Amino acid sequence: MKKKYISLSLVTALLLSTTLVSCDAIKNANNTQKGVAIGTTSGAVIGGILGNNLGKGGNTPLGAVIGGVVGGTIGGLIGNKMDKQAREIENALPGTQVQRVGEGIHLVLGENSVNFQFNKSTLTITAKQNLDKLVPVFKEYADTDIKIYGYTDSKGSESYNLNLSSERAAAVKSYLSGKGLSSSRFSVLGMGEAEPIETNDTDAGRSLNRRVEFAIVANQKMIDDAAKESEK
C-alpha cells in the first residue's frame, strides 16, 4: 500500500484536559483503534477541528474524512470496517494510493488509473476499466458515502481549470452511478489547480497533479449499526 504522510499540528487546550491526537497518531494506530484514537468523549469535536485545519473548512479529501469522525467505541467499529474496505480497494486496483485516516479512506487515482481525453471530461477506456474494478467494492460497502474531487494542473486559466475539474469529477460520478451504485452516495467538487501534490513546472509534475481523489466516509446507516453493535 502506498502511503502519503500527513503533516498536521497537534491541537491543544480543547475541552479542558481532553487527550488529543495528531493525524500521524491516528494513522499509525492499530486497526480498530484508528477510530478510537480520535477520543471517546469528544471524537466528533476533535474531528471537526482537525478537518478544518486540513484546509478550506474540510473542503479537501483529507478534511472531509477527518472532519466526519464519530470517535469512541463506535468510531473503532467503523474504523475496522474501513480497514477491510481499504484492503479490498488496494487488491482491486494495485498501485493506487489508499490511505486510511481516522474513520475513513482517502483514495488518490492518478492519470495512470483514471484519465480523460485531452481538455475534456470524457473518460478513457483505461479509466473506465479501472473504475469497473472499484464497483464491486463500493457495492459491498454500500453504507458509505463518497465525495469525488477533481484536480488539474496549472496550465490554462484558473476558472477554466476549476470548471474542467468539476466536469471530470461529475463524469466519474456519472459513470459509477451507471454501474448500479446509488447516485445519492456521491457528491462532487472541482478543485481546479489547487492543492498540487507536485510542481507544475515539469511535465512529470503536471501529470501527477491531474488526478481524481475520493473521500470515503461512513453514512448514517453505518454509524447507527455501529452504535447498536457497541451496546451489545
Show which residues each predicted segment covers:
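Amphipathic, membrane-active segments
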Residues: 82-113
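Bacterial N-terminal signal peptides that target proteins for export
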Residues: 1-10
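Periplasmic OmpA-like peptidoglycan-binding domain that tethers envelope proteins to the cell wall
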Residues: 151-225
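C-terminal motif of bacterial Sec signal peptides marking the signal peptidase cleavage site
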Residues: 18-22
